[in-house]
Amino acid sequence: MDAWPRCLERLEAEFPPEDVHTWLKPLQAEDRGDSIVLYAPNAFIVDQVRERYLPRIRELLAYFAGNGEVALAVGSRPRAPEPAPAAAAVPSAPQAAPMVPFAGNLDSHYTFANFVEGRSNQLGLAAAIQAAQRPGDRAHNPLLLYGSTGLGKTHLMFAAGNALRQANPAAKVMYLRSEQFFSAMIRALQDKAMDQFKRQFQQIDALLIDDIQFFAGKDRTQEEFFHTFNALFDGRQQIILTCDRYPREVEGLEPRLKSRLAWGLSVAIDPPDFETRAAIVLAKARERGAEIPDDVAFLIAKKMRSNVRDLEGALNTLVARANFTGRSITVEFAQETLRDLLRAQQQAIGIPNIQKTVADYYGLQMKDLLSKRRTRSLARPRQVAMALAKELTEHSLPEIGDAFAGRDHTTVLHACRQIRTLMEADGKLREDWEKLIRKLSE
């Protein structure tokens, strides 16, 4: 049909070339008069087209063909009937549609070059680079990146996949969100196409799956992923996964799957510190072609402490209002523009919330955490809570001391220094600190 090539040409102008090549060019169109059917070689492509492109395809086909009714199906476009031969012939068996190697769904924008490194993510960055340079190496296969949302886990995953493709353009790298794996498996079960579902994974060089915590409680999904994992691991194909917490903390994940995930390298991605947050704001501003003064970047970094997405949201709001009003971006302009956002951020992480989170984490009563008792089981969690209050809020040392049953500001200062010193040598305390930071940043 003429409308589909014209539609595809318009889509090529609107979407990244790799996306068009991966998801849209494999489609074959059949005009049925009252509707148009787009055939995809496998269920993965059907799911992606339905989720990401179908509304725009309907708009374009309605414009070019006067018909916006579009259906998606797995298979290939039926051939036009051929003239019957003069002599009867025995019909041949229909040929199955050939499997098309999965080309991957990688966002090419995310690279190692534009990832801002800091103390909170430097180990994750190093691990992702190693996985891209030596895919399948048992030292980092699987590579599991875990931490709260918006900290850069998916950026590192995409960057590793893009680096793999850059080193070997023929490499087949598959990226899926966990719910896409689940949806594709359900569709394959309904279509009695599990063999095709499994073959997709046999053809790839690297598998990247986001947010595996959503596998929890889905027994059949975990069963299929378990076998997929084993096949890829045995074939030395690289596996990179993300999770919002350490997998052993995810209720509903099968013990054998948790064991498999521990075979390689697991790395925590923590909320960025002040210096990293400021560097991220400046880097994101440059990407947008916006010039912002350092003191504005420092303001945003000081106030927005939870994750990178919040930093980007604040920056986008600031740049958009500056463009709309024609005003220069200054500290005063930023404070005015982001006033409500900054107030909400401060309310989300307050000293009472920190105290309750620390008390719950260590199994303490709030009255004990705030008491004058100085036993080690109480003093250490109390010091951690004070240090977190200094790290995550704008309160002064005297204000923090007042919130802890009227303690002196020198007690708070000592607690902050003590915790910082102890974390250098005490791995368990460092782990507690990082877990509490993640909980408070969620």
Curated annotation (Swiss-Prot):
Superkingdom of this entry's organism? Answer: Bacteria
Task: List every stretch annotated Domain III, AAA+ region.
Answer: 105-322
Q: Name one GO biological process term.
A: regulation of DNA replication
Specify whether ATP-binding is a keyword of the entry. Answer: yes
Q: Where is ATP annotated to bind?
A: G150, G152, K153, T154
Q: Where in the cell is it found?
A: Cytoplasm
**Cellular component aspect of the GO annotation:** cytoplasm; plasma membrane
UniProt main location, coarse: cytoplasm
Gene3D superfamilies hit by this protein: 1.10.1750.10, 1.10.8.60, 3.30.300.180, P-loop containing nucleotide triphosphate hydrolases (3.40.50.300)
SUPFAM superfamilies from the xrefs? Answer: P-loop containing nucleoside triphosphate hydrolases (SSF52540), TrpR-like (SSF48295)
Which residue ranges are recorded for the region named Domain II?
75-104
The record's listing under InterPro entries reads: AAA+_ATPase (IPR003593), Chromosome_initiator_DnaA (IPR001957), Chromosome_initiator_DnaA-like (IPR020591), Chromosome_initiator_DnaA_CS (IPR018312), DnaA_C (IPR013159), DnaA_dom (IPR013317), DnaA_N_dom (IPR024633), DnaA_N_sf (IPR038454)
Q: Which stretches of sequence are listed as region Domain I, interacts with DnaA modulators?
A: 1-75
Please report a single Pfam family linked to this protein: DnaA_N
SMART domains of this UniProt entry? AAA, Bac_DnaA_C
Entry keyword Transcription regulation = no
Query: Which Gene Ontology MF annotations are present?
Result: ATP binding; ATP hydrolysis activity; DNA replication origin binding; lipid binding
Any idea which UniProt keywords this protein has?
A: ATP-binding, Cytoplasm, DNA replication, DNA-binding, Lipid-binding, Nucleotide-binding
Q: Which family does it belong to?
A: Belongs to the DnaA family.
HAMAP family from the xrefs? DnaA_bact
UniProt subunit comment:
Oligomerizes as a right-handed, spiral filament on DNA at oriC.
Report the domain remarks.
Domain I is involved in oligomerization and binding regulators, domain II is flexibile and of varying length in different bacteria, domain III forms the AAA+ region, while domain IV binds dsDNA.
Job description of the protein? Plays an essential role in the initiation and regulation of chromosomal replication. ATP-DnaA binds to the origin of replication (oriC) to initiate formation of the DNA replication initiation complex once per cell cycle. Binds the DnaA box (a 9 base pair repeat at the origin) and separates the double-stranded (ds)DNA. Forms a right-handed helical filament on oriC DNA; dsDNA binds to the exterior of the filament while single-stranded (ss)DNA is stabiized in the filament's interior.
**NCBIfam families in UniProt:** DnaA (TIGR00362)
Query: How is this protein named in the record?
Result: Chromosomal replication initiator protein DnaA
- Originating species: Xanthomonas euvesicatoria pv. vesicatoria (strain 85-10)
Which gene does this sequence derive from?
A: dnaA
